[in-house]
């Protein structure tokens, strides 16, 4: 097993000057060396690009150009990634501590081969980075794709996939392509590793009531696609 895998951490931005620096610093301050940091900006009109340029020496690659939405931008990041793993951390989100990636790698030491998916817990923070407590949905001890019939049990920012099994995001979904993507990654996985660690701080921005309804509708469509309304984890044993 490769004892020192490379993590491609991808940050998507658009007019993110308020939060971007803390996200960048949380990645660049990691004690683990094998990190490929990629930023995809959607042609921001504020100082986002200036901030990116300020830290350019620590960034493997970045682009700033118009996109067709969040998931189109995420697909651009996937196409640029070359690491063993891909991990999305968007503007305002941060890695939990400066040794988070090092601790993930340490948790893999006894593994015969690298897992296909790595996951953990998530802490919620406000716009100022202050803790609001742990995410309401706790990551399950054992995770399968069928676990997602109960919703987004693992926050996207604490879900890490091997690049070789990670598909592009389905841009037909406007709000829940990440839910669909995680299910696809898990369906392609043979080895899934629970780190039992807090991996990320997730910026809680909240959905409008209109977007919340649209998100639930899309999630229902994804669940129907994978027959998640009619299955159980027991069927996966």
Question: Locations of the language-model features?
Answer:
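N-proximal low-complexity "stem/linker" segments adjacent to membrane-targeting elements
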Residues: 1-26
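Short, acidic, metal-binding catalytic loop of nucleotide-sugar glycosyltransferases
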Residues: 26-34
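A conserved acidic beta->alpha catalytic loop
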Residues: 41-49, 90
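Glycine-rich, basic loop-to-helix element that forms the pyrophosphate-binding segment
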Residues: 65-81
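Short aromatic/hydrophobic "clamp" motif used to bind/position activated sugar donors
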Residues: 86
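Conserved donor NDP-sugar-binding/catalytic core segment of glycosyltransferases
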Residues: 98-132
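Conserved nucleotide-sugar donor-binding catalytic segment
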Residues: 120, 134-218, 222
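Conserved small/polar residues in nucleotide/adenosyl-binding loops
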Residues: 230-237
């Amino acid at each position: 097993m490769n004892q020192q895998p490379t993590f491609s951490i991808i940050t998507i931005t658009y007019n993110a000057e308020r939060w971007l620096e803390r996200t960048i610093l949380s990645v660049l301050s990691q004690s683990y060396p094998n990190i490929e940091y990629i930023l995809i900006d959607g042609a921001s009109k504020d100082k986002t690009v200036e901030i990116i340029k300020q830290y350019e020496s620590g960034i493997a690659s970045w682009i700033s150009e118009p996109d067709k939405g969040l998931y189109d931008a995420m697909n651009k990041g996937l196409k640029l990634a070359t690491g063993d793993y891909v991990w999305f951390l968007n503007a305002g989100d941060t890695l939990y501590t400066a040794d988070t990636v090092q601790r993930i790698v340490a948790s893999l030491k006894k593994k015969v081969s690298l897992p296909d998916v790595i996951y953990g817990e998530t802490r919620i923070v406000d716009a100022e980075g202050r803790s609001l407590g742990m995410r309401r949905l706790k990551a399950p001890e054992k995770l399968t794709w069928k676990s997602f019939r109960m919703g987004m049990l693992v926050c996207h920012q604490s879900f890490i996939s091997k690049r070789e099994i990670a598909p592009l995001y389905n841009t037909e979904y406007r709000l829940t392509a990440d839910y669909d993507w995680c299910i696809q990654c898990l369906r392609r996985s043979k080895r899934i590793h629970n780190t039992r660690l807090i991996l990320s701080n997730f910026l809680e921005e909240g959905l409008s009531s209109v977007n919340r309804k649209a998100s639930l509708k899309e999630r229902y469509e994804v669940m129907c696609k994978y027959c998640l309304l009619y299955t159980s984890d027991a069927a996966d044993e």
